[in-house]
Each structure stands twice: as C-alpha cells, then as structure tokens.
Amino acid sequence: MIGDREQVYENIKTAVSLNQLNSKVEPGDPKLLREDKEALLRHYIDYRTAYGYCVKKYIAEAIFYAGTSAVGLITQVSGLENLSEVKGPAIVTCNHFSPLDPAIVRFAMRKAGFTRISIVNQDSNLAMKGFVGYMQRYADTMPVSSLKWFMETEFPNQIKNALDN
C-alpha cells in the first residue's frame, strides 16, 4: 500500500459495499476529468514510439524485475500448477485495489515461467507522481479507459501486440 493502511482498508470496505470494485482506494490517487484522460492517452499513444520512452521502459522493466525478485522473499505463491497447461500467450487479470498489485502478479507469472508480462492498468495511473507513477507509465503497461474511442481503437491493438510478442 502506498497510503495510510487503515484509510486504504476503509476505502476498500466502502468500495466493496457499494459494489464499486474498480474504485480508487489509495489516498491521493489521481482522479481525472474526461479532457485530462483524453490528453493523457493521446500523449501515451504519441510518446510510446519515442526513443526516450524506450529507454525509460527498459529502465522500468529492469527495476520491476529486481523488485519482483524482492517480492519473492516475502511472498508465498500457491496454485501455479494450475498454469502448467498454458503454453502460449495469456491474459491474467486481477482487481487492482493498489497500484502495487502488478508487482505481485508479475512475481507469480515469472515463477510460473512466463517471461513477457504486460500489465493492464487504469488510465489515471499514468498520472501518478513519483516512483510509482514512473513505473505505471513505463513498466510494460497498457492503460484501460472509460473512453470509448480508446477502448475501440488503441486498446485492442495493444492487446494484440502483447499476445503476438
């Protein structure tokens, strides 16, 4: 958890009681207006092919690899045998109550033998500040959005690319 643990727990309880399982629960999580999402996603699309993005992505993935190794020191994973028949690309989902959840998912998938792992995250996570924001933008992530144009055009291309590579 990034924020105050007790506040996060209370926010999770509230979200669950309201059946809002995709609600932001970390204190200070970005909440974006439609025009902010538009600008953020347009920048994401345009910047992804830039040299600077590729360098930052490489650095973020190296950090994430080291981080998932550290997660392994304090995390026990069970049920990996259920993945033994998966022989090709796959889509793994989880309900991200915390932007740190992808570290756990990456660790489990690496332990299961998968090497290329892309994480789907909320578009608003691209607006996070600091180290966690950097990782959300560059560690092989694919934003999902409530914006119809993005989900109809860009997101399917990202999924196809992740499954083909």
Predicted regions and their residues:
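Membrane-interfacial terminal anchoring regions of lipid-handling membrane enzymes
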Residues: 1-90, 98, 161-164
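Soluble catalytic domains of membrane acyltransferases
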Residues: 74-165
